[in-house]
Amino acid sequence: MDWFCNKSEGGASKDIKSGLWELTTMIKLPVLVMALLALAGCGTREDSLVITGSSTIAPLMTELAERYEETTGVQVDVQSGGSGRGISDTRQGLADFGMVSRALKAEEGDLTAHLIGRDGIAMIVNALNPVTRLNDAQIVAIYTGEQQSWSAFGGNDAAINVVHKADGRSTQELFLEHFGLSNDRVKPDMVIGENQQGIKAVAGDVNAIGYVSIGTAIYEADAGAPLRLLPLSGVPATLEQVDQGHYPLSRELNLVSQGELSDAASEFLAFITDPGQAGIYHDYYFLPVSR
């Protein structure tokens, strides 16, 4: 014991104290690092949101996100890719919200739909095409290749160029469902993803026919794109008809989520469904939930 006390006056005590300090530091540092990382992760989640999915909703959501960021400082990253991507990303935790331009299916009951607006799907042709209306049977004949010339419908003696939506797009799903078609029966000349691709294809080809969001089609036509929206089942393709429940290919515009919403997600949802934002929906020719 005397030896220990004597040695501590020299170097032994310092060695022991130094070792104890190093051991304590070794234990504390990982805990501190983990705590800092956890805090950093929490800060990132509350200061940013990711929203992916429907190309129909994406332009509207981008503008709403910009307004929200200006107001709150919370960054909102909006990415399109189709409603299918919105569903998948939300389930995998890659997105806080998925944009889905249809009602959820029974097998998607693990997700929660937050209705933000309404829209419809319109058949479109070039404004220079003399054909002004087609019934459902004629549209089916065109899309299955049974009729391949506009002359069969009082139009020009020219081949019909069929523009069809890609898999994973809710616009395609609803189109097929309405006309009682399976995708393998459709004989397209062009397959597109984004609505803007469909607008560009039909606006640039007098012999093309396609289908896109009513809101997007009206927006682009008003901006000068040479488009004509055809009546569907005899009902004009207008927002008024959608609003009154008369248009046969109307649809929900949803943000979907999984599990409990974070505070940031809840606050964003409240912001975009506030009646004060209704004007932005009207700018994009959509019907907002709150008016």
Label each residue range with its predicted role:
Residues E9, G19-V31:
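Bacterial N-terminal signal peptides that target proteins for export
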Residues D15-I16:
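Intrinsically disordered, low-complexity segments enriched in serine/threonine/proline/glycine
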Residues C42-G84, S88-L94, V100-R291:
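Exported/periplasmic ABC-transporter solute-binding proteins
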